[in-house]
Amino acid sequence: AYEILIGLVGSEMCIRDSAWSDYFDFERGVDRVDTFGVKTLTSGQFMPLEIRNLAIGLMVPAVMVGLWLVVRTGLPLLWIGVCGALCSLLYPWLKYRAFGDFVIFVAYAILPTLGISYITMGKFLPDVWLIIVPVGLITVAILHANNTRDIGTDVRARISTLAMRLGVKTDIFLYMFEVLFPFLWIAACVALGYFPWWSLLTIVGILPAIANARTMLRLPKEGIGVISNLDEKTAKLQLLFSLLFTVTFLI
């Protein structure tokens, strides 16, 4: 029951945080008619207040479930929830100051993994950090692909992202590291006995990872258009990787 509930809360969190971020991006002028990505606001499909209210409304069930889990498990889970809430609320402000990648790694890799460890085992297991690294890197790669593509429009909006500060050449190599290193990490952990041999099934995901990396390499010659949907492709890679990785621990 816990696993199903955690999955539902995780899905709700993604929708909520996306709506919250979209609202502030539109209000700040980051998202306009000519920007890439989701156009729910820039197209006029929804009003800004509708998106904001959706995000706030989705926070209510998350808080209720979180408090219920705290009662069932223990106070340490409360601090994980508080940190997660702060990451969600402050994300727009932090991402405009080049901390977006860091917040995503914390909110979508560190906190959920530690939380699940505590809920299922009743304590924080140090070995979960071995899981956090590969999953977190690919998750951050989604944002990095997005920010690399949006450098031009982000400059116009007068915000700062890690992609802007690093520059395109470094962005390319960082993205390649984020999507390829996790597979090397898995192989090393298997060889050292930390993960079961079944974890090598995740290597199936290296094919789309290589394809994504090659797409990013084409950026200097072919321009921003070539990575227009690379964030979506990276999200699919993350889903495939996470599913395969999860299955290997269930076999």
Task: Locate each region found by the language model.
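Extended hydrophobic alpha-helices typical of membrane-associated regions
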Residues: 194-251
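Single conserved hydrophobic/aromatic residue that forms the stacking wall/gate
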Residues: 2-10, 15
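Multi-pass membrane catalytic core of lipid/isoprenoid biosynthesis enzymes
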Residues: 33-72, 162-195, 232-241
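Acidic (Asp/Glu-rich) catalytic motifs at the cytosolic membrane interface
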Residues: 12, 16-35, 140-163
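Small-residue-rich segments of transmembrane alpha-helices in multi-pass membrane proteins
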Residues: 40, 88, 103-118, 135, ...
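Intramembrane alpha-helical segments
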Residues: 39-126
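Helix-coil boundary and interhelical linker segments in multi-pass alpha-helical membrane proteins
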Residues: 1, 63-78, 112-133, 184-198, ...
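Functional transmembrane core segments of multi-pass inner-membrane proteins
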Residues: 104-157, 169-172
